[in-house]
Amino acid sequence: MATILTDKKAVVLKLKEPSRVTTVIPTAKIVKHNGATLVAVPHRPDETRVLRQLGFKDIPDPLKTHYKFPLAGGKFDPFEAQVETANFFSMNNRCFCTNSMGLGKTVSALYAFDYMKKSKLINKALVICPLSTMERTWADEIFKTFPHLDSAIVYGSRSRRLKMLKEDVDIYIVNTDGIKVIQEALSDRHDINLVIVDEVAMFRNTNERWKSLNEILNKQKPTRRVWALTGAPCPNEPTDAWAQCRVITPASKEVPKYFSQFRDTVMKQISQFKWIAKKDAMDIVHRTMQPSIRYALDDCVDLPPQIIINRDAELTPEQVKAYRDMMSKLSMEYAGGQVLAVNEAVKANKLIQIACGVAYGSNGEEIVLPNKPRIDVLTELVEESEGKVLVFVPLTAVLTNVADELSKKWSVRTVHGGTSKTERDEIFSGFQSDHEPHIIVANPGTMSHGLTLTKGTTIVWYAPIYSNDIYEQACARVRRPGQTKTTVIAHIAASEVERNIYKRLATKQKMQGLLLDLMKEGEIH
């Protein structure tokens, strides 16, 4: 029988043979109490795992016993799914978390890190994540929920990345494509003993990016703890799981050494170049991708009806140039008193157009700018979503391009001012009743009051709109009677103007004065 001393954070055992524990747990100590010989073991995850293997099944989870969870975002108690996920991370050195988008995989991993650091089992962490989540997701969550932790964004030129990696902080955040630059420098960083791989499905192919991660996780310091996060482990085929498992849990007996072995297990060849998934493919993926934890939105009864998430997109060089040119023009107009409350929405919209891939020449001609990073972020969000998706694109000039890109992988229909009522009715009926379309790409102004699209569980705003009423009505399309699931509202932004518009939309603040305030404060960029 084990006794937990919460003030000492220790497990006390009365054993006939203390050596049974002391020989396998170096931190265990023999103590005398009232003439009895007892064994005291630190009540931490590593020791608890060994004790359970020895047969002491009644040892409670250390994190849930001792950790005082900070308020998420400084405001909210963690959901049950977040507590259980954090606890799961703490009890597994290498594992997967495939919780649905919006359930707080980020904060769960940070809760576990915070606890493990306080327990002196982890020193520093490296977070590898998409560029879109570096600042708006990871850095923001650390700042709001864990103000006692320091972080560094390892991004920029090679010299800047290496400089940031030398900073004495608790958590280093690097984008997925930046790990090769710091790969060699990490070989000497034994203090970084946890790696969190966010959106691990981006490593579903054994390319150069995968090889860099494999070097960091399995060759430099195989004892590093590794927690892998993704809401969609197999966005294309069941075979997507193989490379992820080979890099995260290579020692698992469930993971075949060669891709062809795994492919033959989950896929059936029907012609020389065509394979289809077997009926039990996803069951095999689940068995292979272990240890893992998953909560779906439907599993969580303590969630709010809507969850808002923010994703950053990078501007292409062509967009950066056009954006700077427009900013120079606006700055001169502002200095000359030409930016007024009555025209600021039009001027702000020009910046949003550029961020979405459209500019206009001196004669008013439309110029299409490369915007792949924003499309990539949108694709990531659709892959992570559960159920059907509404994508709102306020700019008609961009809407067709967005739909064309998405239609490469999913069934897509578009709704805009030129869509007839008959066609709209057909699209909405199919969305609600049929398997297709999977995605509706729409101008938000065309989504009328009273329209019900409850088969959709995710709304993605490709860009913000300068109207509280249209934003609120568009978001309400999926929050209607008959909606039984928590819905996710995702905002994509590439500029401070967009982020501030979203902030005001989410809190129902008036839009008037937004651009003027930003220019006055010198924060617009």
Report residues per predicted region.
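A conserved SF2-helicase RecA2
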Residues: 466-525
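SF2 helicase motor core recognition
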Residues: 180-185, 236-238, 398-403, 424-428, ...
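Conserved Walker A/P-loop ATP-binding site and its immediately adjacent core
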Residues: 106-108, 121-144, 235-240, 394-396
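Conserved P-loop NTPase motor "coupling/switch" region that bridges the ATPase
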Residues: 122-124, 151, 167, 194, ...
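Walker A/P-loop
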Residues: 92-112
